[in-house]
Amino acid sequence: MAKKGNRIQVILECTEHKTSGVPGTSRYITTKNKKNTPDRLEIKKFNPILKRVTVHKEIK
């Protein structure tokens, strides 16, 4: 039987969008290796609704 992989799919959500009051959310889907990065990801990505680069954090 095949071994389960270390790569999992995670969802990144904008943290600044909640406080701005603008409707909608900015989310990205990516993969991460849970052995190399066991803690939650925090990456700067482009938010098309706010039209600027913001911090996106991993959600569960």
Swiss-Prot record:
Pfam family, one: Ribosomal_L33
GO terms of biological process kind: translation
GO cellular component, one term: ribonucleoprotein complex
Alphabetical list of InterPro entries matching this protein: Ribosomal_bL33, Ribosomal_bL33_sf, Ribosomal_zn-bd
Coiled coil spans: none
Any GO MF annotation of the entry: structural constituent of ribosome
SUPFAM superfamilies hit by this protein: Zn-binding ribosomal proteins (SSF57829)
Keywords, in A-Z order: Ribonucleoprotein, Ribosomal protein
Similarity annotation: Belongs to the bacterial ribosomal protein bL33 family.
HAMAP family noted in UniProt: Ribosomal_bL33
Protein name according to UniProt: Large ribosomal subunit protein bL33
Natural source organism: Flavobacterium johnsoniae (strain ATCC 17061 / DSM 2064 / JCM 8514 / BCRC 14874 / CCUG 350202 / NBRC 14942 / NCIMB 11054 / UW101)
Name of the encoding gene: rpmG
